Amino acid sequence: MVTVRAVTAHEIPDRAPIRVTPGQQVQLGERDTTWPEFVFVTADAGSGWVPARHIEPGTGASGVVRTAYDTTELPTAAGDELTVLENDEISGWSRVRSASGREGWVPNSTIEPVPPA
């Protein structure tokens, strides 16, 4: 596993995270202007940003989830050391675990590799 350090803080959004599962129907909203790989989806359990490749577009503004995705983000402070669980280079985000065991997504622009000791 790769260890990274937060070079800037990452604050999480005010809305609760959502989890979508394969076969689930969702309503598609706008594309994110900062993160164009993401589309805003509304599901039974709430709304959030999901990489568009996880959604099969349907008719109109609906879609079906292709692969499971959890939108949980991890708040970080500059200097935090994190373990990378998944690096999604396409979207520009990595799923990481903190020293306390919490997991979530952070923008790749906020982290850098820690050189081996």
Where in this protein do the model-derived segments appear?
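Src homology 3 (SH3)-mediated interaction modules
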Residues: 1-117
